[in-house]
């Protein structure tokens, strides 16, 4: 089998999210505000950034505690039009207010950028 050489029209991106120790140290008011802000920040990624969300996964039932590195707590797999859109989506964590803080106090995001896998996807 020969590897495909064509370049896709979009970037395949895995956004990986990890909760910080501050999330676990926060009181109920801050946790509830963070959860609300997170939902609002990441709604309508298609309309705002042209991203097609292919799926998401939350592994918080088996991953307990802060996520300083791999494995992360949650993931979004998306086709994103370009690197600028990937950066803008990551910046949501930096820019979104949570009471007197920003999301990045409670959650971190990392993006892995590639292309669609050529095997095992059908």
Give residue ranges: language-model regions:
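Short S/T/G/P-rich N-terminal loop/turn motif that feeds into the first structured element of a domain
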Residues: 1-72, 80-84, 114-122
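Short, conserved catalytic or adaptor-binding loops enriched in Gly and charged residues
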Residues: 44-45, 102-106
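A common structural junction motif
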Residues: 93-104
